[in-house]
Every structure is written in C-alpha cells, then in structure tokens.
C-alpha cells in the first residue's frame, strides 16, 4: 500500500489505493486462547486433521469458526460438526441422485432462497454465515427429502455453491450427479 501511495505522489499511477477492497483476516489461536506456537505446545497438526476429517472439513471449519476478520480459538468439536454436515450432505445427494423428482413449489422456493442467501453472505465476506447457511439449507432439504425426495437441479445448485468451500467433495458429488467436467 505504501508503494502505491508513493507512486501516486510522484505521478506514476493515477490511483492512491492498490485495491478496491481490503480484507484482513484474523488468526486461529490454540484452544487455550493463546497464539499457536510449537514452544507452547498448543499447535494442532493439519496432517492429523486431514487424515481424520478430510481437507474439505478442515477448510470449512477454518472459515466457519467465526467472523473471518476476528481471531478465534480452535475447538475440536467444531471440525467434528463440519464433518458431520459434509457427511449428511453427501448422503442426501447419494440418496436422491437417481430419484426422478420434480421440483415442487417448496423445493423451488428453498433453492431460490439458498442461492440468494449464500450469494449475499458471500459478497459481504461473511464466510462463517455462508457455511451456517449451508447447514440450515441442508437440514431443510433433508426434511423435504423424507417427503418426496429432492430434485437433481436443487442438488446441483447446492453442489455448485458448496464447491468453492469443499472442492473435493464438490467434484465427487458433481460426478455422482452425472455431470461431466469440473464443477468449476
């Protein structure tokens, strides 16, 4: 930022900020509330977490732990919750992917709300609430699935929205839904 200000002052560039939006993220501290440090012994091994929960669950938990601009304390129960959500969504897709379900008014409303809510939350950098929204809509779709099932277009829309946060599961579910190429 300093260089841009300097270059603007000497007339090399005609703008004084290097970007239109600046976002500074917080830090994830150890479960004791202190900065993670090997010397303090409060470091969480990402290798162990990826082995136990998968990299998509780890990525989503880091985004879900709180507002991204604030510091947060690590909590193993949080990654377990995100892992349960991903497993529940995976099961929802697998249980409904071959059903020939027409989207009724309620499913269409849920799909439209999902897309609108997630887009709004994402554009305001409220990534933790994006993931909370995924969980809310997953619960709604599971309820609707018990009645008649969930149509493929709604499942595909959810997978597309989820993929930037859980790309490995997103790709696998995209393929399971019969789509070719990448979900991206």
Region locations from a protein language model:
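C-terminal, charged and often intrinsically disordered regions of DNA end-processing helicases
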Residues: 39-47, 51
């Amino acid at each position: 930022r300093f260089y841009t200000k300097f270059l603007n002052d000497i007339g090399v560039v005609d703008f004084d900020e290097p970007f239109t939006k600046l976002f500074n993220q917080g830090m994830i501290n150890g479960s004791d509330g202190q900065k993670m440090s090997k010397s303090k012994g409060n470091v969480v091994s990402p290798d162990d977490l990826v082995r136990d929960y998968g990299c998509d669950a780890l990525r989503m938990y880091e985004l879900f732990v709180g507002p991204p601009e604030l510091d947060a304390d690590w909590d193993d129960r949080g990654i377990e919750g995100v892992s349960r959500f991903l497993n529940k969504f995976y099961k929802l897709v697998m249980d409904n992917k071959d059903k020939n379900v027409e989207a009724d008014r309620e499913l269409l409303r849920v799909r439209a709300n999902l897309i609108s809510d997630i887009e709004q939350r994402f554009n305001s950098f409220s990534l933790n609430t994006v993931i909370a929204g995924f969980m809310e809509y997953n619960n709604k779709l599971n309820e609707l699935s018990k009645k008649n099932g969930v149509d493929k277009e709604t499942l595909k829309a959810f997978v597309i929205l989820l993929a930037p946060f859980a790309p490995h599961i997103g790709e696998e579910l995209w393929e399971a839904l019969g789509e070719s190429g990448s979900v991206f």
